[in-house]
Amino acid sequence: MVIQFDISRILNARPVSTLNNNHLTGWTKGIDGGGLGDGYLTLSAALFNGDKQPHSLPDDPLFATNNSHPEIKLHYSNTDSLNYQTCNLSGEDSLKFAVPQQKYNAVYLALTSSEGASQLHIVLTYKNNVVIKDITLPDYYADLSPADKNLSYLAHDLAKWGNKNNMTEKDHHNIDLLKIEADAGKILKSITIKKDKAGYLVFWAAAGEKG
């Protein structure tokens, strides 16, 4: 069983342009360039924009289960032209969110790092102890190793668009999904993501997998 964690309180950015009633709402804080460089478009937004066979995000933000991960739901929607979609971090920074207090086999974090890799410190806070896991998240242009069972593509080979919704690169960008093994015998309370100075981090979604 998979639980989609509610991270709405920490969202602070809108990197995906959406289309609602033939109105294109552009992204406002993007995925690179410190939030000023580029963003993504939904498929409907890209087609409305005149892009041919665009490597865009799907209109449905629910990514289906596959061999690498369970269902993961992102926070963009073509029916929502107002609310934030991600939590973006630049420089040395951190974020924290509570989870439903249960026992989990694993947690999944949807992330992108641009401007190079990001060194992350994932803090799992249980009722009785704390576990820290150090992770190097590669740049979102990097190809992932199929042998790495803890890092997979959530969205693969994406184009990116400038601040006027003009396509700047046609493919090769990813949203990665990090799997963190949890202690299935302990109740998890919260997750903290701490980031070192290098890289620009976009946090898209989180979910927990119960036994």
Regions from the PLM with identified roles:
Residues 1-211:
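N-terminal/edge-of-domain interface segments
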